[in-house]
């Protein structure tokens, strides 16, 4: 996944759009998984099933339970922990997991520094535009299980350029 331009994925959600830049040099397998899932429409119609203010928003599970989702490599794949990447602030994109080497399709975006997650989750990108949308997501009302009271959906996830609404196709290896 080398090339002159970074890879971006734009999410159109119930509360607005945001774009993430993928760290293909640091987590190539994870970025390929995420981009391919987006390209295939896997995330379209999926909800953000867990939102915790001052911590993170989580989505990517087509069952909406927090227990589902698979990768393009099969059920699960290995972590790509990179020592240079740390949970230093809001807007960091990482894989949700249930322990080491259990990555599938679920991801989360931080809403604050979370250094206690360093070395436990693969960081593979950052929000490059649309942090206001992330803040709107963070502010939705949730129940006792951190699930939004009203469903917040990903209407569409697409590969593109860095601009909001960009539709420039980016080639991804198989």
Swiss-Prot record:
Signal peptide segment: none
Domain PPIase cyclophilin-type positions: 5-159
* Reactions catalysed according to its record: [protein]-peptidylproline (omega=180) = [protein]-peptidylproline (omega=0)
* Broad EC category: isomerase
Residues annotated as coiled-coil are none
- On whether Zinc is a keyword of this UniProt record, the answer is no
E.C. number(s) listed in UniProt: 5.2.1.8
Question: What are this entry's molecular-function GO terms?
Answer: peptidyl-prolyl cis-trans isomerase activity
What SUPFAM superfamilies does this protein map onto?
Answer: Cyclophilin-like (SSF50891)
Q: Quick one: a GO biological-process term for this protein?
A: mRNA splicing, via spliceosome
Q: Which InterPro entries match?
A: Cyclophilin-like_dom_sf, Cyclophilin-type_PPIase, Cyclophilin-type_PPIase_CS, Cyclophilin-type_PPIase_dom, Cyclophilin_A-like
Give the UniProt keywords, A-Z. Isomerase, Rotamase
- Give me the Gene Ontology terms describing cellular component: catalytic step 2 spliceosome; post-mRNA release spliceosomal complex; Prp19 complex
Q: Which Pfam families match?
A: Pro_isomerase
Q: What's the domain of life for this entry?
A: Eukaryota
Question: What does the function comment of this entry state?
Answer: PPIases accelerate the folding of proteins. It catalyzes the cis-trans isomerization of proline imidic peptide bonds in oligopeptides.
Q: Which family does it belong to?
A: Belongs to the cyclophilin-type PPIase family. PPIL1 subfamily.
Protein's name according to its UniProt entry = Peptidyl-prolyl cis-trans isomerase-like 1
Q: Which organism is it from?
A: Cryptococcus neoformans var. neoformans serotype D (strain JEC21 / ATCC MYA-565) (Filobasidiella neoformans)
Q: What is the lineage of its organism?
A: Eukaryota, Fungi, Dikarya, Basidiomycota, Agaricomycotina
Per the record, the gene is CYP1
């Amino acid at each position: 996944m080398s090339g002159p331009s970074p890879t971006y994925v734009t999410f159109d959600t119930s509360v607005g759009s945001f774009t993430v830049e993928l760290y293909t040099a640091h987590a190539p397998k994870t970025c390929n998984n995420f981009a391919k899932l987006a390209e295939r429409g896997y995330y379209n119609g999926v909800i953000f099933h867990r939102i915790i203010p001052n911590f993170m928003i989580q989505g990517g599970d087509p069952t909406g339970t927090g227990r589902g989702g698979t990768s393009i490599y099969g059920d699960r794949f290995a972590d790509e922990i990179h020592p240079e990447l740390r949970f230093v602030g809001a807007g960091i994109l990482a894989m949700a997991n249930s322990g080491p080497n259990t990555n599938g399709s679920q991801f989360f975006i931080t809403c604050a520094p979370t250094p206690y997650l360093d070395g436990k989750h693969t960081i593979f990108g950052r929000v490059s535009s649309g942090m206001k949308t992330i803040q709107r997501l963070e502010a939705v009302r949730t129940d006792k299980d951190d699930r939004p009271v009203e469903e917040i959906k990903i209407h569409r996830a697409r590969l593109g350029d860095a601009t909001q609404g960009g539709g420039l196709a980016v080639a991804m290896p198989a």
